A protein has these predicted regions:
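Phosphate-binding loop of NTP-binding sites
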Residues: 96-245, 251-257, 323, 568-678
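N-terminal leader/targeting and accessory segments in enzymes
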Residues: 1-99, 103, 248, 276-281, ...
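Acidic, Mg2+-coordinating active-site environments of NTP-dependent enzymes
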Residues: 71-80, 179-181, 194, 203-358, ...
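Short, conserved loop/helix-junction motifs that constitute active-site signature segments
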Residues: 62-63, 80-82, 199-202, 232-237, ...
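Active-site beta-alpha connecting loops in nucleotide-dependent enzymes
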Residues: 48-51, 340, 367-370, 375-442, ...
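Short glycine-rich anion-binding loops that position phosphate/pyrophosphate groups of nucleotides
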Residues: 48-50, 190-191, 213-214, 247-248, ...
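Glycine/aspartate-rich loop-and-adjacent alpha/beta segment that forms the canonical ThDP
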Residues: 469-500
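C-terminal helical cap/extension that packs against the catalytic core
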Residues: 4, 8-9, 68, 72-81, ...
Length: 678
C-alpha cells in the first residue's frame, strides 16, 4: 500500500496541505466528483445526502487521481482502508471541507468582494442584473448561479447546481481571482446553504429577496426552509445586507442583523424602507418607475417586465448602493440592463410576415413565482383585449404539495391553460399531471392536458391569436428535459420558435440539393449522410432558417435546435395537422395502397378542386414523408388523403398518431418486408 496517514479532527489542516503539495503537481485541483477530476488531481471523498463519494475512490484512481483525501468517522474504519496511491484520512472532514478548500486555493474569497443573494425567487435575476450594471461601469465581475459560471472575460461554464459543491465553489473563486475579478455575485440556494457549500467563503454583502413555498421535498417544513436561508446572514465578516421588507422574513432579519442594512419595498405602507419604487408602468416592452431613496428620486426606464422584477431591481439597487454607487448612477445603469435568459424572456420570431402571438419564457416553478408572472402578463393582455395562455408543468421528485397550488393559480389568472410535463425525472408524467389538476375546477373548459411538452408548446403557439400572450413557464433557461434518469435536449424557446416559424407557412424541406429560396431546411442524419454538413450550402441557397439537432454557431444561418430532428419532424407534423378540422383519409396495406390513394385523390379533386385537396406525392409515406406531407396543409385545403407505409413493426401506429385520420382504409396484409418484421 502507498503512503497513508490519518489526521485527527483537532489537527490543523495546513499540515495535510503541505504533505499534499509535496506529492502532487503545482496545478493539481481538488474534486469531490470522480467524474470531473483529471490526471494529477486530488479526490476529496465525503458522504453525501444520497450517495457516498468514498465508494468512488477506485474510480478516481482509475481517472488518474494523484492522492485521496477521505472523510473518516472512526479509527477502525480508517484501518480497513487501503489504496494504491497516497491517501489521507481526516476525522469529520465533511464539516471541514470548506476550510480545507479555502486553504488549498490560498483564500481566494479574501481577495474578492463576494456578494450573495438568497430567496425563493429572484436570485438569478438579481445576480445577473448586478453583474450587468457593474460591467456597464467597467468593473471586472464574475457570476456563479443557476445559469452557470461566467468569468470577467466573458467565458462561461455550465453548472449543474445553483450553488456548486463547496470544493467547486472555492476552485471557481480561485479561477475568478486568476482572471482578474474584483467582484463575484453568486446565488445562495437553501439546499446549498444547508449543506455547507458556502463554508469558508468570505461574503461581504448578502441580500434576501423573498420566501415562499419550495423545496419542501428536501426541507420538509417551511420553518426548516427559512432557517436554511437565514444561515447566509450569520456568515462572519458580513459588511452589509439588503433586505426585502415586504416579506415577513425580511422584516425579521432587519430587526436582528447587526451590520449596515438597506431595506427595500414596493408597498406604500413601508414608508420606512430605504429604497422604494413608485409610479410603475408596464407594457410589452418594459417597465418604467421612479426609484427613490427617501427624498431623493430618479426615473428609471427598463427593459424588464413586472412588479416582481422591479422588486428584484430594488434589491440590486441596494447592493450597488452598498458598493458606493449614487442613486443617479444606479438609475442610469438600469436603463442599459436587459432581461435575463429564461426570465420573462420574449421570443423574437425569425419571420413576421404573418402576425404571431407574443411568446414569453419564464423559469417560474413555484406557486408564488407563477402568480407574479401571470399577474404581470395578465395586465398586458387585458390592455390589448387579448387572451393569456399558460403552458406549465411541475418537476418530478420535488415538493408535490405545490402542484395543485400551481394549477389553481394558472386557472385563476390565465384564459387558456395547457398542463404538461416539466422534468418528470423518476416520476410518471401522468401522475404529476394528476396532482396538478387536483387544484383545477372540475370540468374547466379553458384547460387542456397535453403530457408531451413539445406538443403542448406547439399547440399553444399555433392556436393562440396574434394579439395573445403565451407564457411557457417552469423551465426558463434550461436546455434539457430530464426523465427516467436521462437528459435529452429540450429548449422551450427553441420549440416556441418552431411553432412561430410554422405559423409563417414556410415550406419545410430536407433535400439540400433542391432547396427553394425562402424554405426552412430540416437537417436529417442517415447511415451515409448528415444534413448538418450542408448548412452553409442551404444558407447560400436562400434558406430562411434550419431546424437542427444542435446549433452550429460557425454558420451564418438562423437555426432552431430541437434535438433529434427525425423525432422533431414527427412532432411538427402532428402539431400542424391538429390545426386543421378537415376530413383526412389514411390509406395503407401491403399492396395497392399507392394506386388506391391516387384514385381517391382524383375523386377528391373532382369534388373540391385540385388545389383544395392534399395528397401524398411520390414515396413520401414513411416517418419522414408523412409529416412532410402534413406540413403542406394550408387553410385552403378542404380534404386530404395520406398514404401510410410500413417496413418495421410499430410504424403504422406512429404514422396514424401523427396523421389522426377520420377514415382509415387497409387494402390488404401480405408478407412484405419480412427482413424487418422481427
Amino acid at each position: 500500500m502507498m503512503h497513508a496517514e490519518l489526521f485527527a479532527k483537532n489537527v490543523a489542516l495546513q499540515a495535510l496541505i503541505e504533505k499534499l503539495r509535496a506529492i502532487v503537481g503545482p496545478d493539481a485541483q481538488l474534486h469531490m466528483d470522480s467524474r470531473t477530476l483529471k490526471a494529477g488531481d486530488v479526490f476529496v471523498a465525503c458522504p453525501g445526502l444520497v450517495g457516498d463519494a468514498r465508494t468512488y475512490v477506485e474510480a478516481a484512481i482509475q481517472a488518474g487521481a494523484a492522492a485521496i483525501v477521505l472523510h473518516v468517522e472512526s479509527i477502525r474504519e480508517w484501518q480497513d482502508r487501503s489504496a494504491s496511491i497516497p491517501m489521507f484520512g481526516v476525522e469529520n472532514l465533511k464539516t471541514r471541507v470548506g476550510e480545507f478548500a479555502d486553504s488549498w486555493y490560498r483564500q481566494p474569497s479574501a481577495d474578492l468582494c463576494v456578494v450573495a443573494v438568497t430567496g425563493t425567487n429572484g436570485k438569478t435575476s438579481c445576480v445577473q442584473w448586478l453583474a450587468q450594471a457593474l460591467r456597464v461601469e467597467g468593473v471586472a465581475v464574475g457570476v456563479i448561479g443557476t445559469l452557470g459560471v461566467t468569468y470577467p472575460d466573458g467565458m462561461a461554464a455550465d453548472g449543474q447546481l445553483t450553488t456548486p459543491d463547496v470544493v467547486s465553489m472555492h476552485r471557481t473563486l480561485a479561477e475568478m481571482r486568476a482572471r482578474g475579478a474584483k467582484i463575484v455575485a453568486l446565488e445562495a440556494s437553501s439546499i446549498g446553504l444547508d449543506q455547507g457549500r458556502l463554508d469558508g467563503v468570505r461574503i461581504r454583502h448578502a441580500a434576501f429577496t423573498n420566501l415562499s413555498r419550495d423545496h419542501l421535498n428536501y426541507h420538509l417544513t417551511m420553518q426548516a426552509y427559512e432557517a436554511a436561508k437565514l444561515r447566509l446572514f450569520t456568515h462572519v465578516g458580513l459588511q452589509g445586507v439588503v433586505l426585502n421588507v415586504d416579506d415577513p422574513v425580511g422584516v425579521k432579519l432587519a430587526r436582528t442583523v447587526e451590520v449596515p442594512t438597506i431595506t427595500f419595498s414596493l408597498s406604500r405602507q413601508a414608508d420606512s424602507a430605504n429604497l422604494t419604487a413608485k409610479d410603475l408602468s408596464t407594457n410589452a416592452h418594459g417597465t418604467a418607475f421612479v426609484l427613490c431613496a427617501h427624498l431623493e428620486c430618479v426615473k428609471a426606464q427598463t427593459q424588464v417586465l413586472g412588479a416582481h422584477n422591479v422588486a428584484n431591481l430594488l434589491c440590486v439597487a441596494g447592493l450597488l448602493r452598498q458598493l458606493g454607487w449614487s442613486l443617479a448612477r444606479v438609475g442610469a445603469a438600469f436603463e442599459k440592463i436587459h432581461p435575463v435568459s429564461g426570465r420573462l424572456q420574449r421570443i423574437q420570431p425569425i419571420l413576421s410576415h404573418t402576425p404571431s402571438p407574443t411568446v414569453i419564457v419564464d423559469y417560474a416553478h413555484t406557486p408564488d413565482a407563477l402568480e407574479r408572472v401571470l399577474r404581470t402578463l395578465h395586465g398586458i393582455a387585458q390592455s390589448r383585449s387579448a387572451k393569456l395562455w399558460c403552458v406549465f408543468g411541475c418537476g418530478g421528485n420535488r415538493d408535490a404539495g405545490k402542484r395543485s397550488l400551481m394549477g389553481a393559480v394558472a386557472q385563476k389568472l390565465a384564459d387558456r391553460v395547457v398542463v404538461t410535463s416539466d422534468n418528470p425525472r423518476d416520476e410518471a408524467p401522468q401522475a404529476i399531471v394528476a396532482d396538478i389538476i387536483v387544484g383545477l375546477a372540475s370540468g374547466a373548459a379553458n384547460v387542456l392536458i397535453e403530457v408531451d411538452r413539445a406538443q403542448a408548446i406547439l399547440h399553444a403557439v399555433l392556436s393562440a391569436d396574434a394579439e395573445d400572450i403565451v407564457l411557457l413557464a417552469g423551465k426558463g433557461h434550461e436546455a434539457y428535459q430530464e426523465s427516467n434518469g436521462q437528459r435529452v435536449a429540450f429548449d422551450d424557446g427553441q420549440w416556441a420558435q418552431a411553432g412561430l416559424i410554422l405559423r409563417q407557412e414556410c415550406s419545410i424541406q430536407t433535400d439540400s440539393r433542391k432547396l427553394d429560396a425562402g424554405a426552412v431546411f430540416l437537417a436529417l442524419r442517415g447511415d451515409n449522410f448528415d444534413g448538418h454538413d450542408y448548412l452553409e450550402q442551404v444558407a447560400a441557397a436562400g434558406a430562411v432558417a434550419a431546424i437542427v439537432d444542435q446549433a452550429d454557431t460557425s454558420v451564418a444561418l438562423t437555426q432552431i435546435a430541437l434535438g433529434d430532428t427525425r423525432a422533431a419532424l414527427l412532432m411538427l407534423g402532428r402539431a400542424w395537422r391538429k390545426q386543421f378540422a378537415l376530413p383526412i383519409i389514411a390509406v395503407t396495406g401491403s399492396n395497392g395502397k399507392t394506386t388506391t390513394k391516387e384514385m381517391i385523390a382524383s375523386i377528391l379533386a373532382a369534388w373540391v378542386g385540385e388545389s383544395n385537396r392534399l395528397a401524398t406525392t411520390g414515396n413520401l409515406n414513411n416517418e419522414l414523408g408523412v409529416p412532410l406531407t402534413l406540413l403542406r396543409l394550408r387553410r385552403s385545403h378542404q380534404v386530404a388523403v395520406i398514404e401510410l407505409g410500413m417496413n418495421h413493426p410499430g410504424e403504422i401506429a406512429i404514422l396514424a398518431a401523427v396523421t389522426q385520420p377520420n377514415v382509415a382504409l387497409v387494402n390488404n396484409a401480405q408478407r412484405e418486408h419480412p427482413e424487418f418484421m422481427v
